[in-house]
UniProtKB/Swiss-Prot annotation:
PROSITE patterns: GUANYLATE_CYCLASE_2. Residues 901-1056 form the Guanylate cyclase domain. Disulfide bonds: none annotated. It comes from Trypanosoma brucei brucei. Could act as a receptor for an unknown ligand. CDD domains: Nucleotidyl_cyc_III. This is Receptor-type adenylate cyclase GRESAG 4.1.
Length: 1242
């Protein structure tokens, strides 16, 4: 029994007609309380409310009162059986209560003489027979009767309980309509979500009648929801409403052909039942071989019609029925759903009523509602309406006043009926508008739409998945927020036990944080069960039939399948990484693990190293291991490539170090025995083998104290925090422990969990989620923070090395960081054996050649001893990443007669930020460059050049350029910069400017922090866009790219120069080059004529409003414009980072002299190797000169450019005294390890 406010069958609490009497026992208790000391009196008096709670209620006597219920639950246009079923259920409920309220009042039902009685006649009859009495209306049934009765209810101060209308038109706030079921749009929402996310269908069609108001309303709602979910219907079968007229067969067939050509996999059916074309359409689906297997989804009002029409069509065509093809919704549980205690309660009441009552002859047998589930559902609805009415009457303050009764209904009351909760009527859905809508709360106190499927017996069966819920605060589907879903596919290999188990454990972690089955759930997992032989073929088939955004978990040999995005793949055998943009690795690459383990070995004593490797790439793996060991002064004594059936146990011997790569289940036991036999031996395994065989390793080393001790000899490298350590200071681990049972705490389950958390973070701001946009977002975000674990940087850029472009040297599709060496024993003891100190945030790996007289590490260490002297002269030296270029020349505008749209960008106050935050700016600028380049690729634009922190971008399409600029600002706004220091500095710069300029008002310095966070975040970038003809478009033989000359690039650069940080300006020429349709899709503010320096006539300018509500200071017309023709005559931006023409300051001269003195002792090849990292980290462009090697003159120019850039930042810091705000504090020496700057995996 659920005791709630107003709860309890047949009794109420003191706020109603009932009151509590003090029993003799209660009176004795109170007398005893009076005899106690004051201290105990006070204490026990606090318990008085609790004592009262347990006193038996005694209800007021209302035996002389009669409450009339007017039954308008009928409609001559509906099946008689359906009408009878609802009324029979209603009567069964009230009969179970003896037709009495809890206070003894009689409940009397006024029924229509026949179902042909007009609504007006029955209503007048009910009002006439209820003068001076409380009258409640049951129904009406149907949209038209509900619309008709609304005004009549208001005139007579009446309430209609459980009206049924199939239009949202009557579901707005009306205190006279007391609905107990969800609205029609909620059912549509459930059907849309089921088709899109649970069936995962990329092609869903619609069918409706144009002239019908309800159909139009449903169509518009469906289109809105699908758009929000990032989808569009593949086709729409829409015909004019027949209105009783014959529809020409030829017209229907023409529309049918157009509809079928879109290859729909499912159709949402919400055309009106009276439309002849609805039946024609359903039969046509069954007749056409192209659509006979298509899913049909329809709301609850279509259940009878859909099942009958479909089954008749199949019988006429001699086709068999396919279970699961027809899908409908419901507003109450099915009468046969015995999982619900409310349904079991209904069955008891219904059985008793039908056994003892002959009013409903059609339902003489109690099991009738179980055989006909469609009518059984109607009975459940009627019974539930009776229970709600009974509870409402029990909670009314009096049973004679209609106004008082109506007001009592809307006091946020819930009615508990077994496990079904109805209530919270009258809640505010929108406080700002005071818009009140009755809200239905179902199981677990949330609005609920049930999903049903038709089985082979043409019976409705409840679905375990797909039902839609939303919280009590959402009273209407109009207020429910839905988002674009992500459908993830994981493979279950049925013919490989290791892979099958791995998939199950991975999915256990991935699914553990799936949200409850509510409306804002975004991530949905589908499994593909297949054998290894058919894996690739099956995946290609799924690609066409499912809207899969990512393939996850165990992937075997399918990474080369095109047009799929793979996230966190788990190979069954070791593989070296090849950069495929659509493959995103979350764990360390094998080459990185071997590199880190080589570092570990170089710091420990070793008696010899050998390798046992199994897999298709065994020879390549051995070569990579050998290079890693040689790099750190360790030699690989021997290696053995094993076949699939070769046991490793035959080759394990002695106390040396052995790399065992590509394990099978027998190998795990062999490794454990080897370490237990040879206590000084060490075995190194890839982390992927730990993932696959973790349970076997734990079992193999957990047999005795000796075996546990030997587990210290099993070593591997990982980037994970410890998944099993309790009270660990890791937010992700703590979250993992909250969602996953302790018995499942293992690395593979944790990887699945971490993958889902990563996806939740990545898609949080995505409006459309499929394979390509998902990969785009990951590369755009680059560094992704998930709880306390970082992934990245991910980069799909190319790098410039010297004067040539080298593909994939800077590209990075892996996100593991902080790789450390663990032992199995340390893992079991919940501690790290040893941390190598390696922070893997690199693009690749740098190896020494075999036979070299010294290692790479030695070279860098020696160089750093010298370079510390240089850094002493420059307290502002901080590295950043190499400028990358996207030289896809197919995207470059080449025709001189075609207009070119040019974009110039620059970071606002970049020099001041470098001076204030030398430790933050390298990563911030690197993130800036990655986001810009990712968008350049996404919108098929062309990167002309970078100068310092500035970009020059060309586009054939003006609209693509505008879209790029708009999304650029949004990317910066939503990016996790990892600090508020940049924002603090920008506000500080505004304050400083306001002190010097009286007319200047800081736009953001005094902004409320919450408002600021919605409008501003991190780096502020100004953007200028101009469209026009270029005087010259030249292909540069050195860079192999295209450059643009003349007034157009000059105008674009000048436009950018007057903008404020975060502002996008476009000239009138750029704006007018957009089509009328393009201009409708953007929001601009006309700024009028703007006088630009060096331009004779004012230029009409527009501001692209990328972030609504952002305000800017006046345009910076006073900003000095630097027109740099450079060495080749091309135009650059007004960036303050160009060093090609600038003079060397005093600080720069000191830096240049020191560098030249130090480098003079190195050969030319070493000078290039030592200087390149500075150019990369400080974003200094190399001289554009074709040379086979760096000669003395070339090196001197590179040093000069570095000195200009570093000297400028040093001078700015000295002039502004920015050390007070610098994130580096007062330190004058900054040393950053250089070994991870230009590393490459071979």
């Amino acid at each position: 029994m659920h005791w709630q406010e107003g709860g309890g069958r047949g009794c109420v609490y003191t706020h109603g007609n009932c009151r509590r009497n003090l029993t003799a026992r209660a009176l004795q208790a109170l007398q005893h309380v009076e005899a106690l000391t004051c201290h105990y009196c006070v204490s026990l008096l606090h318990l008085l409310p609790l004592l009262l709670m347990w006193m038996p209620p005694v209800c007021a006597d209302d035996s002389a009162v009669t409450v009339n219920v007017l039954s308008m639950m009928y409609n001559p246009e509906y099946y008689v059986e359906k009408v009878n079923a609802i009324n029979a259920g209603f009567d069964a409920s009230l009969s179970a209560h003896g037709w009495k309220t809890g206070s003894g009042a009689t409940i009397s039902v006024i029924r229509p003489p026949s179902y042909n009685t007009t609504a007006e006649d029955i209503f007048q009859l009910g009002v006439k027979q209820s003068e001076g009495k409380l009258l409640v209306v049951f129904g009406p049934l149907g949209t038209d009767p509900v619309v008709w009765v609304r005004d009549k209810l208001k005139e007579n101060d009446l309430v209609a309980i459980a009206p049924i209308a199939y239009s949202s038109e009557v579901r707005g706030w009306n205190p006279h309509l007391y609905s107990i079921s969800v609205e029609p749009n909620a059912e549509l929402l459930a059907l849309i979500r089921y088709a899109v996310v649970y069936l995962g269908l990329p092609r869903v069609g619609l069918m409706y009648a144009k002239g019908n108001g309800f159909d139009k309303e449903s169509y518009e709602f469906t289109m809105r929801i699908m758009e929000i979910m990032g989808r569009k219907p593949c086709g729409v079968f829409a015909v004019e409403s027949s209105g009783g007229r014959d529809v020409l067969e030829g017209q229907l067939n023409t529309k049918w052909g157009q509809f079928v050509a879109t290859r729909p996999q499912a159709v949402l059916l919400f055309s009106s039942l009276e439309e002849e074309t609805t039946g024609w359409f359903v039969k046509k689906i069954a007749q056409d071989n192209r659509t006979v297997d298509m899913y049909l989804l329809a709301p609850s009002s279509f259940q009878h019609f859909l099942i009958k029409t479909w089954s008749d069509a199949l019988v006429s065509l001699n086709r068999t029925f396919t279970p699961g093809q027809l899908i409908t919704t419901g507003t109450v549980p099915l009468a046969s759903d015995n999982r619900s205690s409310m349904v079991r309660h209904f069955q008891r009441d219904m059985d008793n009523y039908l056994d003892t009552n002959s009013d409903w002859k059609g339902f003489a047998k109690p099991e009738h509602y179980l055989k006909d589930d469609k009518l059984g559902e109607m009975m459940v609805f009627g019974w539930l309406a009776g229970e709600v009415l009974f509870e409402a009457l029990n909670n009314a303050p009096q049973l004679t006043n209609r106004t008082s009764f109506m007001e009592s209904l809307y006091k946020q009351r819930r009615y508990v009926i077994d496990d079904f909760v109805v209530g919270d009527f009258g809640g505010e859905c929108d406080e700002a508008l005071h818009y009140r809508v009755p809200c239905v709360i179902a199981i677990k106190a949330a609005a609920w739409t049930h999903m049903r499927v038709v089985d082979d017996s043409l019976s409705l069966k409840p679905m375990k998945k797909g039902s839609v819920t939303w919280s009590v605060s959402e009273c209407s589907s109009a207020n429910v927020q839905v988002s674009a879903p992500l459908i993830g596919l994981y493979v279950v290999l049925t013919d490989d036990k290791v892979a099958q188990r791995a998939s199950m454990r991975w999915s256990l972690g991935a699914r553990s944080i799936e949200e409850a089955d509510d409306v804002d759930k975004r991530i949905f997992f589908h499994s593909l069960k297949v054998n290894l032989k058919n894996l690739t073929q099956s995946l290609e088939q799924v690609r066409d039939t499912k809207a899969v955004a990512a393939v996850l978990g165990v992937t075997a040999d399918i990474l080369s399948v095109p047009n799929m995005t793979f996230i966190g793949p788990i190979p069954l055998f070791p593989r070296l990484n090849k950069f495929w943009r659509n493959v995103i690795h979350l764990q360390p690459l094998l080459a990185h693990e071997l590199y880190v383990l080589a570092v570990y070995l170089s710091n420990t004593s070793s008696t010899g190293v050998k390798a046992l490797v199994r897999g298709g790439e065994a020879s390549e793996v051995v070569d990579t291991l050998d290079k890693s060991l040689v790099t750190f002064g360790v030699s690989l004594d021997s290696s053995k490539t094993l076949g699939d059936g070769d046991p490793m146990s035959s080759y394990l011997s002695g106390n040396g170090d052995v790399f065992c790569i590509g394990l099978t289940p027998p190998d795990v036991a062999a490794v454990a025995r080897h370490l237990q036999t040879h206590l000084r031996a060490r075995v190194f395994v890839p982390f992927n083998d730990i993932l696959l065989f973790y349970q076997e390793f734990v079992a193999g080393f957990n047999a005795s104290k000796e075996s546990i001790a030997s587990s210290e000899g099993l070593l591997f490298a990982t980037s994970f925090p410890h998944w099993g350590k309790k009270n660990r200071k890791s937010d992700m681990v703590a979250r993992f422990h909250r969602h996953v049972n302790e018995s499942h705490w293992d690395p593979l389950t944790f990887l699945g969990f971490a993958t889902t958390r990563l996806l939740q973070v990545v898609i949080s701001n995505m409006r459309k989620v499929n394979a390509e946009p998902l990969a785009d977002r990951i590369y755009t975000e680059s560094n992704i923070r998930v709880d306390d674990v970082g992934f990245g940087p991910f980069s799909d850029a190319e790098c410039v090395s010297g004067t040539s472009v080298s593909a994939n040297e800077c590209a990075s599709n892996f996100g593991a960081t902080n790789i450390s060496v663990w032992s199995m024993g340390a893992c079991a003891e919940f501690k790290l054996a040893q941390d190598t100190g390696w922070d893997d945030t690199v693009y690749g790996l740098c190896y020494s050649a075999r036979g070299s007289t010294h290692t790479v590490t030695d070279s860098w260490n020696n160089f750093w001893v010298c370079i510390r002297l240089v850094i002493i002269y420059c307290p502002w030296c901080v590295p950043t990443h190499l400028p990358a270029e996207r030289r896809n020349n197919n995207r470059a505008p080449k025709e001189p007669t075609d207009p070119v749209t040019l974009i110039f960008t620059d970071i606002e106050s970049s020099t001041a930020l470098w001076a204030a935050h030398p430790d933050l700016m390298p990563d911030a600028v690197a993130a800036h460059h990655r986001m810009v380049r990712s968008l350049i690729g996404r919108y098929k634009c062309y990167e002309v050049k970078t100068v310092g922190d500035s970009f020059m971008i060309a586009s054939k399409s003006p609209f693509a350029a505008v879209q790029l600029a708009q999304e650029l600002q949004l990317c910066f706004l939503h990016h996790d910069w990892g600090t508020n220091a940049l924002d603090d500095s920008y506000r500080e710069f505004e304050e400083q400017r306001a002190e010097g300029e009286c007319e200047y008002t800081p736009p953001t310095a005094h902004m409320d922090p919450e408002v600021y966070s919605r409008l501003w975040n991190g780096l502020r970038v100004r953007v200028g866009i101009h469209t026009g003809l270029c005087d010259i478009i030249r292909h540069d033989e050195v860079t192999k790219g295209y450059d643009y000359y003349g007034r157009t690039p000059n105008m674009a650069a000048r436009t950018e120069s007057v903008a404020n940080g975060g502002q996008v300006l476009m000239t009138h020429a750029a704006y007018m080059s957009l089509s009328a349709e393009d201009r409708k899709q953007i929001d601009v503010t006309a700024l009028g004529d703007v006088a630009l320096r060096g331009v004779s006539d004012p230029v009409k300018m527009y501001q692209l409003n990328t972030v609504p509500s952002r305000n800017f200071a006046a345009l910076r017309l006073d900003r000095e414009y630097f027109f740099d023709e450079g060495e080749d005559g091309t135009t650059t931006s007004t960036s303050d980072h160009s060093s090609s023409r600038a003079d060397v300051s005093e600080s720069g001269q000191i830096i240049a002299t020191a560098l030249q003195s130090l480098l003079s002792t190195f050969k030319t090849a070493h000078r290039e190797k030592l200087l390149l990292p500075y150019c990369e980290r400080w974003r200094v462009p190399l001289p554009r000169k074709a040379a086979s090697e760096w000669d003395d003159a070339y090196c001197e120019e590179v040093v000069r450019r570095i000195a200009v850039k570093v000297g400028r930042v040093a001078d700015h810091g000295a002039d502004s005294g920015s050390e007070s705000s610098s994130t580096q504090g007062s330190s004058s020496i900054i040393i950053v390890p250089f070994y991870d700057m230009h590393l490459q995996e071979y």
